[in-house]
Amino acid sequence: MNLDLLLILTAVIMLIVGFAVGAILQKKAHEREIDGANKTAKGIIELAEKEAATRKKEILLEAKDENHQYRSEIENELKDRRGEVQKQENRLIQREETMDRKDATLDKKERTLEEHESRLAEQAQQLKEKQAEVETLVEQQRTKLQEIAELSHDDAQKIILDETKRNLDHERAVLIKESEESAKEHADRTAKTLVAEAIQRSAADMVAETTVTVVTLPNDDMKGRIIGREGRNIRTLETLTGIDLIIDDTPEAVVLSGFDPIRREIARMTLEKLIQDGRIHPARIEEMVDKSRKEMDEQIRQIGEQAIFDVGIHTMHPDLIKILGRLHFRTSYGQNVLNHSIEVAKLTGILAAELGEDVTLAKRAGLLHDIGKALDHEVDGSHVEIGVELATRYKEPATVINAIGSHHGDIEATSIISVLVAASDAISAARPGARSESLENYIHRLEKLESITNSFKGVDHSFAIQAGREVRVIVKPEQVTDDQATVLARDVKNQIEDQLEYPGHIKVTVIRETRTVEYAK
């Protein structure tokens, strides 16, 4: 029994010791787990700190990038705004300069008007003084005549009135001369300055078109192929193009004759294509004519676009551009109308710039002033009426329409640009070499000029000289006085302006000559 108790105690002790050892081992294992956990946690913390530092750097870099990008956007926006502000400032400066130029022009015109009014006031005062002197002189002469000649009151009055009339005619002629000379001096000085500068800054080639075109052939055998069997080829070509083909003894050449330059050009293009192709028969001729017409339409469009580009106009209705291109194949007195229109546009733009007007609008009006000539042989009416209708149809500005309608005086000019277009048109048409007239028209104009001057009372005879640029009027000295000669020159000038159409100016010179001959014996 003691042994059993001892075993039980031993077992209990062993169990207690086992529990103790197990507890100790479990505690150590737990401590090891805690140490491992601490190490793991420490590693995680260190890793987290590293990742946090890395993320922090990335966030800082991203923030810096965003800040830099935002700053760049702000700077670009500020730069754009500064540019807009600068553009607005430049526009304001240009407007101020334009206003200054207009103010200067107005001031100059006001000063000129004041000077003219002052001169007129002085002349009016002088006229009053002269009239007072005349009245005094009349009274003195009346008394003297009654005392010395013992004339009746009516006779004396008639003599005095006749002499007074002669004196007043003399005074009127003097005042007219002084006023005209003063106005002409100022106007000529200003106009010459503007026109000279405009002409120096503008240059345009003028090519005198004819009514025939010569096509060169590779050999004379080609003439027979162009004529064709029984003349079928030449008849087909003439029928389709409306142009006469003249085939004569001229070596290696065919002459195309016609008054429509566009048809003549289509015929030339067709004939050259046929010669190059070698196949010449009615069907091929018809095909080539159609092809040449299409090429001609494209060429006309390109010519119109080049014209507005040369002038500096950027927008225009496509149909109006094509009509403008047709002017290249239209002539007036031998002057190419498109080149003339470009020259007028440049001259008008230069003059408008000098006067502070809208340069682009002035060029547009100058370029389109003769647009009606492109269709005047197809549509009834004058080229001015057709031009106004075209400009209205394609919604051109009112200033352009008025310039087209008024450049020949058909309607009243309502703007300065319209006046400048008419002046530039006259400058371009009247300069030497720009235009040529037929001999018949030239002779008729000279005869008409002389007949107008010979129709005035007191004119002995007249001579048109300088190719019709001047007319010299010889008057009868016993019928026309010196003072009346001045008035006669003005009347002849007005009559010429009313009855004749001519480019440029015509100088009227009245010559009064008195000769006294005596013979010594």
From Swiss-Prot:
The keyword Nucleotide-binding does not apply. It is an enzyme of class 3 (hydrolase). GO terms for cellular component: plasma membrane. Its main location: membrane. It comes from the Bacteria. Residues 77-107 are annotated as: Disordered. InterPro entries: HD/PDEase_dom (IPR003607), HD_domain (IPR006674), HDIG_dom (IPR006675), KH_dom (IPR004087), KH_dom-like_a/b (IPR015946), KH_dom_type_1 (IPR004088), KH_dom_type_1_sf (IPR036612), Ribonuclease_Y (IPR017705). Residues 211-271 form the KH domain. Residues 337-430 form the HD domain. NCBIfam families: HDIG (TIGR00277), RNase_Y (TIGR03319). This is Ribonuclease Y.
